[in-house]
Regions:
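Extracellular/lumenal glycan-associated context and N-glycosylation machinery
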Residues: 1-63
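Short, solvent-exposed secondary-structure boundary motifs
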Residues: 8, 219-221, 346-347
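Secondary-structure junction/capping motif
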Residues: 9-13, 73, 258-261, 320-325, ...
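Short coil/turn linker and secondary-structure boundary residues
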Residues: 10, 114-116, 213, 302, ...
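Intrinsic-disorder/low-complexity, polar/charged segments
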Residues: 13, 28-33, 92, 169, ...
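Short hydrophobic/aromatic-rich motifs at helix boundaries and adjacent loops
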Residues: 19-21, 38, 51, 173-177, ...
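An amphipathic, basic-hydrophobic helix/alpha-beta surface used to engage anionic
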Residues: 44-295, 338-342, 356
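Acidic, glycine-rich A-domain
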Residues: 268, 274-404
Length: 404
């Protein structure tokens, strides 16, 4: 995005500060010992740097290219195109950030453009490394020049921000898909029958007796020399619901620091599961904290990216009411085959959801992060030992979990 509205900014470089201190020193020295020649020379250098620097101050148009998202702890380049809009050359141009957001670290210095002719464009890249997931406003950098003597720095400050979404860490897991192929539909409208949704093309296979002639793939037939039929992702057997708990109990809160390892592990595990099952199962419903998100009308790739974006913003909470989103989720369980719980603690709301999933014919899997010594026990519908898998936050964050 191009930025032309800016304010002039004048600062002293380290060398300029030393020269200014020397000038002040000789000023007071002349009160005792005649040293007007040295003082005059120093003042002349400062005035020359001020006048020349002001005349040749950078007047550039900055065009920013910031990626929409990046995974936490991965380096990313922020690219800036500098176009000299003045009628005189600009020298020693450099980009400098006044202050990066907490959680974003600049890696290494930025390059310097030694000379930029009028109308010429140069590109500079700034490498940053996000330390925490979340949504960040990246401020526009100051385009500054310390020409001619590297004593004073003239710059232009642009008051604008670009949003950067930092996604949680995720990696591929070996997830069994045997439950995703179970026929669990007991009624309702299938995915392809919804008016606002079109079936997603999956590929083709050999034509079998009983297949609809309307789905014959003529191109594949010509290529393979055998009848072939089109396949679509239009059944509810490969649908899942993902539930991520963000209520952090006191036993999981660290004594110091803002980052909660258990919550980060839960979010990372949720992102990894969504990524790993994406080719075999689509996440239709995501209950992230108290918010229920529905992705029925989204196609496969943008759906996964949207889920990761939502998980990037999950915040810790001491408590929230789950009755309304839980009721909305329970009414949709007949449309999915698998319900995956990622919990920090257990309460009766999740017990009720687990029972509702069992009555709907869904298979449920519960991952309890840093589980307490005693679980919730058994209910009339569900056996704790059959569905709950205790996992360690350290194992998740270090990538030691390879198979679920």
């Amino acid at each position: 995005m191009a930025r032309t509205d800016a304010t002039i900014r004048l600062t002293l470089t380290d060398a300029g500060k030393m020269l200014l201190l020397g000038t002040v020193f000789f000023f007071f020295t002349t009160m005792v010992i005649p040293a007007f020649g040295v003082l005059t020379a120093l003042l002349s250098v400062l005035l020359t740097a001020l006048l020349v620097g002001f005349v040749l101050r950078p007047r550039v148009r900055v065009t920013e290219t910031v990626p929409d998202s990046v995974v936490v702890s991965q380096n990313v380049k922020l690219r800036y195109a500098l176009e000299n809009t003045a009628g005189v050359p600009a020298y020693d141009l450099q980009l400098q950030f006044e202050k990066m957001p907490d959680g974003i670290e600049q890696v290494g210095p930025t390059a310097v453009v030694s000379r930029l002719a009028p109308g010429e464009t140069a590109e500079l890249a700034v490498t940053v490394r996000p330390q925490r997931r979340g949504y960040y406003g990246i401020p526009s950098p100051i385009c500054q020049s310390s020409f001619p003597f590297n004593l004073l720095s003239f710059g232009r400050r642009h008051r604008a921000e670009q949003m950067l979404t930092v996604l949680p860490v995720f990696y591929r897991l070996q997830c069994p898909v045997r439950h995703f192929s179970r026929h669990v539909r007991t009624g309702g409208t299938g995915f392809a029958g919804r008016a606002e949704v079109s079936p997603e093309y999956a590929g083709n296979r050999p034509f079998l007796p009983g297949d609809s002639p309307r789905r014959i793939d003529t191109r594949a037939w010509a290529r393979l020399s055998v009848p072939a039929t089109k396949e679509y992702h239009n059944d509810s057997d490969s649908r899942a619901a993902l539930i991520v708990d963000s209520r952090v109990p006191a036993r999981l809160r660290p004594s110091e620091g803002d980052e909660i390892p258990a919550l980060e592990a839960a979010v990372s595990l949720a992102a990894s599961i969504a990524f790993s099952i994406n080719q075999n199962c689509l996440v239709d419903l995501l209950l992230a904290g108290p918010e229920l998100h529905e992705y029925t009308s989204w196609l496969r790739s943008p759906r996964l990216h949207k889920i990761h974006e939502v998980l990037a913003g999950v915040e810790a909470a001491e408590g929230y009411d789950l009755d309304v989103p839980a009721a909305a989720l329970a009414s949709r369980l007949y449309d999915v085959a698998e319900v995956i719980f990622i919990l920090l603690d257990w309460d009766k709301t999740y017990t009720q959801l687990l029972e509702s999933a069992a009555r709907a014919g869904c298979h449920s899997t519960v991952f309890l992060i840093d589980a307490p010594a005693q679980g919730p026990g058994e209910t009339d519908e569900v056996n704790w030992a059959d569905v709950v898998t205790p996992v360690s936050s350290d194992d998740i964050l270090t990538g030691r979990i390879e198979r679920l």
